[in-house]
UniProtKB/Swiss-Prot annotation:
A matching Pfam family: TPP_enzyme_N
Gene: menD
Family note: Belongs to the TPP enzyme family. MenD subfamily.
Gene3D superfamilies, per database record: 3.40.50.970, TPP-binding domain (3.40.50.1220)
Species of the source: Parabacteroides distasonis (strain ATCC 8503 / DSM 20701 / CIP 104284 / JCM 5825 / NCTC 11152)
Catalysed reactions listed for this entry: isochorismate + 2-oxoglutarate + H(+) = 5-enolpyruvoyl-6-hydroxy-2-succinyl-cyclohex-3-ene-1-carboxylate + CO2
Assembly with partners or alone: Homodimer.
Keywords from the named record: Magnesium, Manganese, Menaquinone biosynthesis, Metal-binding, Thiamine pyrophosphate, Transferase
Protein name, UniProt field: 2-succinyl-5-enolpyruvyl-6-hydroxy-3-cyclohexene-1-carboxylate synthase
Amino acid sequence: MYSDKKNILQLVALLIEHGVSNIVLCPGSRNSPIVHTLANHSFFNCHSVTDERSAGFFAVGLALHGGKPAAVCCTSGTALLNIHPAVAEAFYQKVPLVVISADRPAAWIGQMDGQTLPQPGVFGSLVKKSVQLPEIHTDQDEWYCNRLINEALLELNHHGKGPVHINVPISEPLFQFTTPELPKVRVITRYQGLNVYDRKYDDLIERLNKYSKRMMIAGQMSLIYLFEKKICKLLYKHFTWLSEHIGNRIVPGLPIKNFDAILYATPEEEKEKLVPELVITYGGHIVSKRLKEFLRKHPPKEHWHVSLDGEVADLFGSLTTVIEMDAFEFLEKIAYMLENRQIEYPKAWEYKSRNLPEPEFAYSEMAAIGGLIRSLPAESALHLGNSSTVRYAQLYTVPETVEVCCNRGTSGIEGSLSTAIGYASASQKLNFIVIGDLSFFYDMNALWNGNLHNNLRILLLNNGGGEIFQALPGFKMNERTHRYVTASHQTSAEGWATERGFSYSAVHNAEELAAAMSAFTQTEQPSEHPLFMEVFTDKAEDVRLLKEYYHQLKNSSQAQNI
């Protein structure tokens, strides 16, 4: 029987899956649940060494002899510090050493309890990875614990070998050994490159062809990649391709971009048909919260993430494989390995996408965004502010030749204007910036810089505060809360924009919007000055129109059985 501590069970099961069989065990009470579970499983070759300093070096020797990772397990407190010299040796000799330390719960560190010191990160830069496991009480705790252990064990051989540290907090009671078997655990594997002549990749390609419901999701990328026509033909029909405007042109064909609206409009009982078996992601961040929730609620059997850095990014909680290589090289290689058979899954998504019309909003900030996107000149650049702006833009079709930029690395509202102006200063294209009022006024001294050129055109959406917070489902605000959450204001940018040399126009209704948009997007006569259009709308009306649109979308879709 094994320990009842779920973080220990995850750890031991994953040590087995990652092939760490040589374990050096040091005496102690806090680590006894780990020791008991390891010592009573036939997979492990256990060695008893009392002195932790010697135990660490003993484990280094085991790893050096076979070339495979070895582990050392110790109790809490200064016992862990005694392994430090061995960790340093393993780091500089590039030995795959796993240091497993038991610990007291974080609440008791620094409270004069026995054998306690701050153990997480104690080895500093001398380990390739250091993780602090959670004690598991919820499904999310279990997912997080599993991911951390996988991350640590994957680093043993990532870009060279070296030591890792796994700190395991264990609450009392310590000695409940009531678990008859180890759990089945999610194992994350990493492939570095994709050599088609290497037999270890046969399994990967076999798994790829096993699934008929395959989804490819392209995240943010600030580039255009032109696939050969042959590659497009081989790849496109085998997957449902999802991308957002910030993905630009990185898909071999036309991706589905209105998937957020599709997921909203599709009744819950019909969503099962849309659930993929395999998801492959590449590129950076994804804006759609609805897509993330959908794939977390309905996890695919496998999720592969392709990236040059090979980092673990478990966005949907179902990551199984990291493929460390250029995404486009990966796509071009698998194109020739896909079995040529009829795949119906993409058609379900494509049908729903085709039958969802673009919205037609009355005068509002959504109408202003749509009006600009429909009028964008070819070969221009579109910079989207964060929060509501980037989300509302996704409701419309952006011309393929338009570059789309947005600060989605951390998705904050600060710096969007400065980033866009910096980009425009180095660009020969017309650069259109769409930004909300809070984001603009937060970063308004971006206009103070002396790098404002006539290729710059700013569309400021001013509805007197952060209306997106007003639209959050389930969040009902009283007047006092509303003031602070939405940061209501009565500020105009006119004085500052004209002071900084912009040709300024104010818009208050649909007629003014149409007239101003024509001048704002025209390319026949180059403007002598950068342009600034401030569109004033009503917060409450913006929210009402948005909710009305989604309500109609759901009703219309159900009526048409989309």
